[in-house]
């Protein structure tokens, strides 16, 4: 994309928040790369590798890098796939209701819990906000959506129903 004298190129990056991008901004023979919160332990590490491939051999004048962590002190980094396997093991050990607290904007984590519920023959019950997130991103990426996937349901608190009927 060209904006005035600037050429801006976006690169999809594997991030816990859906739709994040790295940006290469070029003008007058100079370039700035903003990496976004780049990571290799998510569900799509190929995105970061592609960014590295595309930019290898190119000169970047300034790089702005964001990161929430740069590894684990003991070197035992857990991927989202490994975390999903651990969730499945824990859910299989639980005799009854399983509750989890995480941000539904962390789409990889949300997907891990939904997939874990399916693998353990349980129903994933989302709050209204989580259902909204799933609905919004379903047009961009294949995710289970309440109403279309029988193992994903939505919990509507009575106060939500009461306020909806008053309108």
Task: Label each residue range with its predicted role.
Residues 133-167:
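Acidic, Ser/Thr-rich peripheral helices and adjacent loops at domain boundaries
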Residues 1-119, 123-129, 134, 140-147:
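His/Asp/Glu-rich metal-coordinating catalytic cores
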């Amino acid at each position: 994309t060209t904006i005035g004298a600037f050429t801006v190129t976006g690169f999809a990056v594997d991030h816990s928040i859906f739709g994040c991008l790295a940006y290469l901004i070029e003008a007058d023979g100079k370039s700035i790369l903003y990496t976004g919160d780049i990571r290799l332990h998510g569900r799509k590490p190929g995105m970061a590798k592609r960014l590295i491939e595309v930019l290898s051999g190119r000169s970047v004048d300034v790089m702005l890098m964001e990161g929430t962590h740069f590894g684990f002190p003991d070197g035992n980094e857990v991927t989202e796939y490994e975390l999903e396997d651990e969730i499945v093991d824990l859910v299989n050990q639980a005799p009854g209701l399983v509750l989890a607290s995480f941000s539904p904007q962390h789409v990889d984590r949300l997907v891990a819990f939904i997939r874990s519920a399916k693998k353990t023959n349980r129903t994933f019950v989302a709050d209204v906000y989580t259902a909204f997130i799933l609905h919004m991103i379903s047009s961009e990426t294949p995710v289970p959506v309440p109403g279309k996937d029988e193992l994903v349901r939505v919990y509507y608190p009575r106060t939500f129903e009461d306020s909806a009927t008053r309108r």
